[in-house]
Amino acid sequence: MMTEAQGPVVSIGSATVTYDHPPIISPVSYPKARPTQILDIRKRTSRIDLYHEILAGLRAKDKELPSLLLWNDRGLDLFSEILNSDEYYPRRRETQLLQTHVNEFTRSISSGERLIELGAGNLQKTVSVLRCLEQSRKHVEYCALDVSHAALQASITELKAQLPFASYVTIRGLLGTYNDCASWLKQSGATVRTTFLWLGNSIANFEPEDATSILADFLQTKASPSHSPQMIIAVDGCQDVEQILEAYDMPNKLSQKFVFNGLSHANQILGSEVFRPQHWTFEGKWNPVKSMHESFYVAKKPMSLDIGNERFHVHAGEKIRAITSGKWPKDKVTSICQSAGIKVLKGWTDEEGSYGKRVTQVYSRGSSC
């Protein structure tokens, strides 16, 4: 399912991110949607991947659990509640940005292209983009990528209900992870230009080095030398610590519920109650060195976690990282893109100057930016 000191950034050509769009009222009496076309592109089951990622995270010096644990069906429902909370400023700012500039950044998407959205958890923003493309009479194949089949099914069905008479934009789903999508594109071969839509500051859930690697991986596939893939990326660059803490550690404990769902999902993956929620507490904090908000599971007492033939010792007060959200300044975003072989072509920011978008394009590593 992402940032700059001045605010979010959106990139087109190699990366672009956008959050929620204005609420859209569904039509009352449209015909029932046809079954959704979802292509399973997983290389292997996510359960196997997550099992080994859990072990790897617990073996690390600074323990962590994979953030993908948070994004099951229950997690997506909880995150939807977070998006609708007044404290969660990224949605409000990205909505404003989209309303103002959607026509501008969709101009970079040409008729005949494929548009892949990396994460399809919140579709109000997506509807605005697809509606703009439809009104521009651009033939575009929209593919929503997500790890949850149920979320894909529901999201795409709703999209088709919002665009019941679409004749230019086609809609389908891709079931898999970011890595699955990159591998699928390489193996299937690109016959048309691909634009990636990466909204909601999702790119900044990764460490900068990992974000660079993911961007480079996605952008290796070309339909032809003259049709380099591009991305539209939204990045949050807010540096108001008080506002950030309110958004990621809400008074109603919704943030804690969202993060603790990861423990329940981990137990499901491991096949036993390794993590007992009552033995843990939640902590969210701002990391000024990395310009990043971090959420942790904190052990209330010493304990041993037995997984297979391995035993992991956790002391009282020890933190296991659950998820991060970077708030990257403009120069940081530019640096990440350049390291991935991407040139930032254009950017926009919201009225407060702290949420933005960038338009980018792949360039030869030997070229200058």
Swiss-Prot record:
It comes from Aspergillus flavus (strain ATCC 200026 / FGSC A1120 / IAM 13836 / NRRL 3357 / JCM 12722 / SRRC 167). Its EC number is 2.1.1.-. Belongs to the methyltransferase superfamily. Signal peptide: none annotated. Induction: Expression is down-regulated by ralstonins, lipopeptides produced by the plant pathogenic bacteria Ralstonia solanacearum. Expression is positively regulated by the imizoquins cluster-specific transcription regulator imqK. It holds the Pfam family Methyltransf_33. Pathway: Secondary metabolite biosynthesis. N-methyltransferase; part of the gene cluster that mediates the biosynthesis of imizoquins A to D, tripeptide-derived alkaloids that serve a protective role against oxidative stress that are essential for normal germination. ImqB is a canonical three-module NRPS that assembles the tripeptide backbone of the imizoquins via condensation of Trp, Tyr, and Leu-derived precursors. N-methylation by imqF and phenol oxidation by imqC, followed by cyclization via the FAD-dependent oxidase imqH carry out the three-step transformation of L-tyrosine into tetrahydroisoquinoline. The keyword S-adenosyl-L-methionine applies. This is N-methyltransferase imqF. Keywords: Methyltransferase, S-adenosyl-L-methionine, Transferase.
